[in-house]
């Protein structure tokens, strides 16, 4: 299982984690997917105070990464970057498991197991 953070993503995530209330040694980010978006799956990225019992745990630099075990196969090999532009900025996911992505870049399909799509908001 591998989720890779670019240097920009790691720096931004470290800043988020340090800026949250009660920073602890177990605080990290939880990466996963949920049903949704116009292609079927959308990425989730949340601050977590500690891992859940079944989480896959990785660390890159000073950022702990907790991976939802049900999403592990869908996000294995994902590279997370942070991009800044005139029109938008945020975390971008490059997923080798995605068989298709939507035009807005917020959701993806993965083989035969993709749930029904809903329009992007």
From Swiss-Prot:
GO cellular-component term (any) = cytosol
Checking SUPFAM superfamilies in the record gives:
HesB-like domain (SSF89360)
Q: What are its GO biological-process terms? A: iron-sulfur cluster assembly; nitrogen fixation
InterPro entries per record: Fe-S_cluster_asmbl/transfer (IPR050322), FeS_biogenesis (IPR000361), FeS_cluster_insertion (IPR016092), FeS_cluster_insertion_CS (IPR017870), HesB-like_dom_sf (IPR035903)
Annotated protein name in UniProt: Protein HesB
GO MF terms held by the record: 2 iron, 2 sulfur cluster binding
Q: Which domain of life is it from?
A: Bacteria
Return the similarity comment. Belongs to the HesB/IscA family.
Q: Which UniProt keywords apply?
A: Nitrogen fixation
Keyword Ligase set for record: no
